[in-house]
């Protein structure tokens, strides 16, 4: 494949559109709440308590938000590691989505930390616990965010005509691409390992030695789903041709990963002797909802004709994305009982608004970047 076969161009157009202004308003509301959180403490802006070490700011903004950021991971794996050049038009939009997903997930951690001013301690060897899986996740996420900045840098350099530096960067970019595949593989699986450690505090419907595998599979699946979702939405909102031919090929991989996940999930329950929990346990409804969404999404992709229809692709990607979201939410929050006693947790309106604001900021920045920087491939690329 040749990376020069596709030309990228800014989409142009007004930035101050209605969607952007709505997102900006949501970000402003979240900003006011965050000011209250940092001046008055966690209790002023959340329902977190001594019985629950984290809430939706970790479960959604970080654990789920980082999976949204796996679009760049899966496309880099396909395009550069497996040398599937047909996916190259999807690279820059996917890397941009990853940059925002991981960058904002990293910042969201600082919102949840009680002593956020000590966050840099993980970088100091005399404070670090080398056997901690949480340390590995933190270092990997921070490093991968920097890697994504470097991977997206060619778009900035191209936009401002800094061709000399861009040419030099291209010579060493393969190192960062390799890191961009290695690091998410490490920390996405380690997000599962973190919950293996909690033992009986996690419902037997989800507690398993296979958690690292399941988290890696959902990261890959959600990465594919985000690529499809983002591509279809961009085509609709920016009046661009649908990228159905390349998305059709991607959908076959989504089908394979989703099918593997479902088979392994049920096999794991059978091997552990917990299959009866799916109808009788206290959280069985959440498990059934998670699996129903996953199975519905993959069944929709089985007919080959559906893989060539943008509506079916979008619906399937949406179902699989929500299934991945629910699986991670089940593991990190719904199926997790961290303390014995009269402790309960349900997110406050302020917590929810902060989370909404984080995703609104991601959308607003995406709108600015695709309009001002060469992110999207030209509708009629030149071949040479």
Identify the function of each model-found stretch.
Residues 1-71, 75, 363:
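N-terminal signal-anchor module of multipass membrane proteins
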Residues 6-15, 20-30, 86, 124-306, ...:
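Long, contiguous internal "core" modules enriched in hydrophobic/ aromatic residues
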Residues 21-30, 98-106, 315-324:
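Hydrophobic alpha-helical membrane-insertion segments
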Residues 23-43, 107-111, 182-192, 366, ...:
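Alpha-helical transmembrane segments of multi-pass membrane proteins
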Residues 52-117:
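Membrane helical hairpin/interfacial module
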Residues 103-104, 184-186, 261-264, 320-329:
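Aromatic-anchored segments of alpha-helical transmembrane domains
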Residues 308-384:
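TerminUS-proximal long segments
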């Amino acid at each position: 494949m040749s990376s020069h076969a596709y030309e990228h161009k800014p989409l142009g157009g007004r930035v101050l559109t209605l969607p952007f202004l709505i997102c900006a308003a949501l970000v402003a509301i979240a900003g006011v709440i965050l000011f209250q959180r940092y001046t008055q403490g966690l209790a002023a802006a959340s329902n977190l308590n001594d019985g629950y070490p984290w809430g939706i700011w970790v479960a959604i903004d970080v654990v789920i938000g980082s999976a949204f950021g796996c679009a760049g991971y899966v496309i880099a794996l396909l395009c550069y590691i497996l040398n599937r050049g047909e996916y190259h038009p999807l690279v820059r939009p996917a890397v941009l989505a990853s940059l925002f997903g991981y960058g904002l997930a990293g910042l969201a951690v600082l919102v949840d930390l009680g002593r956020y001013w000590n966050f840099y301690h993980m970088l100091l060897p005399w404070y670090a616990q080398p056997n901690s899986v949480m340390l590995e996740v933190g270092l990997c996420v921070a490093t991968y965010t920097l890697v994504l900045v470097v991977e997206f840098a060619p778009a900035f350099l191209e936009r401002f005509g800094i061709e000399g530096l861009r040419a030099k960067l291209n010579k060493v970019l393969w190192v960062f691409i390799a890191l961009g595949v290695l690091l998410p593989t490490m920390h996405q699986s380690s997000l599962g390992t973190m919950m293996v450690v909690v033992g009986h505090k996690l419902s037997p419907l989800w507690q398993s030695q296979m958690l690292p595998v399941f988290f890696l599979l959902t990261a890959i699946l959600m990465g594919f789903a985000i690529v499809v979702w983002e591509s279809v939405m961009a085509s609709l909102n920016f009046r661009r041709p649908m990228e159905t031919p390349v998305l059709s090929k991607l959908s076959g991989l989504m089908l394979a990963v989703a099918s593997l996940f479902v088979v392994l999930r049920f096999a794991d329950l059978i091997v552990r002797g917990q299959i009866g929990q799916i109808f009788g346990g206290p959280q069985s409804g959440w498990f059934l909802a998670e699996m129903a969404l996953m199975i519905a999404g993959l069944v929709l992709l089985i007919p080959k004709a559906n893989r060539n229809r943008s509506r079916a692709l979008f619906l399937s990607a949406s179902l699989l994305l929500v299934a991945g979201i629910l699986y991670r939410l089940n593991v990190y929050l719904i199926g997790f009982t961290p303390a014995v006693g009269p402790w309960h947790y349900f997110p406050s309106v302020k917590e929810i608004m902060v989370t909404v604001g984080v995703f609104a900021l991601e959308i607003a920045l995406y709108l600015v970047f695709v309009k001002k920087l060469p992110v999207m491939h030209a509708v009629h690329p030149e071949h040479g």
